[in-house]
């Protein structure tokens, strides 16, 4: 019976389309409804709602449907709709930027109908069809009640040294499950290509039986409750927002280098409301949009992210000003990590490290 149930579950997972896994939230038009904008996104609604509200203030006849999914499910749904010539969303906003580049490369987007800001960094756009809206560092979060101030690692070298205390940290380190998280995969892949510490760090995570999670919010919750002492490669936007609610959360901007990711937006080739899709993206790049993104949501903007981060005092650990930020450029180079052979080899190395260490 167990085998039968398991088989049926696998069959159900195979036949259910990715779009069925979406969670839709509707924002009714404040005036007489004349059109609808559908946003496909991975961002937690609470972080992007201020931008949606501002958009509707200037577009009162537009209702908005916010279609939230995990990064890989969103990509699968958009790619499937594109291949079939069907509609899924008017605009797609995702932190899984390699998948976003692939959608553009596969002809699933179209050029913007507005001019990009002249001061937009070169790394933050590609082919006038994909633009980075945010500036989000990959940080280390830790439990201030679980680490003494003098123990807080300032960089990856010190983190590897700290994790030698396996009896103390076993099962109490959290990071992304890179097999199920697009943003987790890109952070890990970039680490492997940029850091001489990657092999030792991966070994340390495995030896400490690091726990794997789908999302930054789950890792942060683990630290906040004391179940985890430390979380690696967490999105700084989520961590900074949660730290304002709970000072128990400490944040580290690694001083050796701090990756910065930009949630990228495109207009779908099969969008039904291309006007509104362009208007929303253009709004995010204005002074008003930057203020909303850099406010309580802490997403920050691709236009002013470094300057805004340098003003932040995390209260402990290396400050943003000490970090060597390395933004991940929106370019075809990101497609290397999606090559099937390279992805398989990378994931095999990941699994092997965790299996040898007994990690989750």
Model-assigned labels for residue ranges:
Residues 22-101:
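Early extracytoplasmic/lumenal segment of secretory-pathway proteins
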Residues 42-49, 87-88, 94-224:
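Extracytoplasmic ligand-binding site segments that recognize negatively charged/polar headgroups
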Residues 268-330:
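Mature extracytoplasmic/periplasmic domains
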Residues 139-146, 187-189, 261-274, 292-293:
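A bilobed periplasmic-binding-protein/Venus flytrap-type ligand-binding module shared by bacterial periplasmic
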């Amino acid at each position: 019976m167990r085998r039968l149930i398991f088989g049926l579950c696998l069959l159900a997972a195979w036949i259910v389309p990715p779009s069925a896994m979406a969670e839709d939230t509707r924002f009714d038009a404040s005036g007489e409804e004349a059109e609808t904008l559908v946003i496909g996104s991975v961002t937690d609604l609470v972080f992007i709602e201020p931008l949606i509200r501002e958009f509707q203030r200037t577009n009162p006849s537009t209702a908005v449907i916010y279609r939230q999914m995990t990064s890989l499910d969103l990509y699968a749904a958009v790619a499937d709709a594109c291949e079939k010539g069907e509609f899924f969303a008017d605009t797609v906003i995702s932190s899984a930027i390699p998948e976003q580049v692939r959608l553009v490369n596969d002809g699933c987007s179209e050029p913007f109908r507005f001019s990009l800001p002249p001061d937009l960094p070169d790394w933050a756009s590609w082919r006038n069809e994909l633009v980075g809206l945010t500036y989000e560092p990959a940080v280390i979060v830790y439990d201030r009640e679980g680490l003494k101030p003098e123990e807080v690692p300032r960089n990856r070298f010190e983190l590897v040294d700290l994790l030698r205390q396996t009896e103390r940290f076993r099962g109490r380190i959290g990071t992304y499950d890179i097999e199920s998280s697009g943003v987790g995969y890109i952070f890990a892949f970039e680490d492997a290509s940029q850091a001489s510490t990657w092999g030792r760090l991966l070994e340390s995570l495995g030896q400490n039986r690091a726990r794997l999670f789908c999302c930054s919010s789950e890792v942060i919750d683990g630290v906040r409750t004391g179940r985890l002492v430390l979380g690696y490669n967490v999105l700084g936007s989520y961590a900074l927002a949660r730290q304002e609610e709970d000072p128990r959360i400490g944040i580290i901007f690694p001083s050796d280098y701090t990756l910065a990711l930009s949630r990228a937006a495109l207009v779908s080739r099969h969008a039904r409301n291309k006007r509104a899709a362009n208007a929303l993206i253009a709004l995010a790049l204005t002074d008003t949009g930057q203020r909303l993104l850099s406010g309580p949501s802490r997403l920050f903007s691709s236009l002013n992210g470094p300057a805004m981060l340098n003003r932040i005092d995390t209260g402990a650990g290396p400050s943003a000003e000490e970090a060597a930020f390395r933004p991940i450029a929106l370019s075809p180079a990101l497609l290397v990590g999606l090559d099937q052979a390279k992805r398989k080899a990378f994931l095999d190395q990941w699994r092997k490290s965790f299996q040898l260490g007994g990690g989750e």
